[in-house]
Amino acid sequence: RRLGTDRIDLYQAHRPGFSVPQDETLRALDDLVRQGKVLYIGTTTFPAWKLIEGLAVSEKLGLHRYVSEQPPYNILERRVENETLPLAAAQGLAVIPWSPIAGGLLSGKYPVDGSSPKGSRGDAGRQIWKARISPSGRVAAAKIAAYAESRGWIPAEFAFAWVKDRPGVRRRSPVPGPRSTWNSPCRPSGKA
């Protein structure tokens, strides 16, 4: 009711609960689908083994199954190519990548010198962003930005286009997630 809608099209379980059995989670999600409150269920940031476990539990118990996975995926973070993307293809799961511009790192706003724009994730000091916006990440991002710019692309736009054109990713599915227009792959140039 608070969302102002009768139903949710896709309800995603965010990160697996390792202390909660899959059957418990899936029964709760299945109840929502059967009640008409949710059309489809999916996951976000699940390791491939937890996804396949969930699919097996759904099949065994006759429950609605996950239809999608939303992993972090970008030109610098490609771990999902080893297991998640092949699993998704084999099981007919949609892949909805998040962080296609790597938390802003691929937007071109984080120089190699280690400085961060005021108010940015890199400036916030949270440990997760310190690990992602690392010196080696900045160097790699600068090389990617130079490559993109040499071909007339805005760096964020290039990074977004790279993700959406990957095998196994539905073309309109990556979630940009920019915090500002600086990061947005939707800035005008029309290539993404």
Region locations from a protein language model:
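Glycine/proline-rich, positively charged
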Residues: R1-R79, E83, A90
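Conserved short secondary-structure transition element at the edge of the structured enzyme core
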Residues: V33, P100, A124, K130-K191
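Beta-sheet entry/capping signal
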Residues: L39, A94, R170-S173
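Glycine-rich, positively charged active-site loop/lid region within alpha/beta enzyme cores that binds
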Residues: L87-Y147
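Tryptophan-centric aromatic hotspots in well-structured domains and transmembrane helices
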Residues: P16, W49, L63-Y66, W98-S99, ...
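Glycine-rich beta-alpha junction loops
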Residues: P47, Y73-E77, S99-L106, W162, ...
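Short, hinge-like loop/turn segments at secondary-structure boundaries
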Residues: S58-G62, L85-L87, V112-S116, S189-K191
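Short coil/turn motifs that cap or connect alpha-helices
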Residues: D6-I8, A94, I154
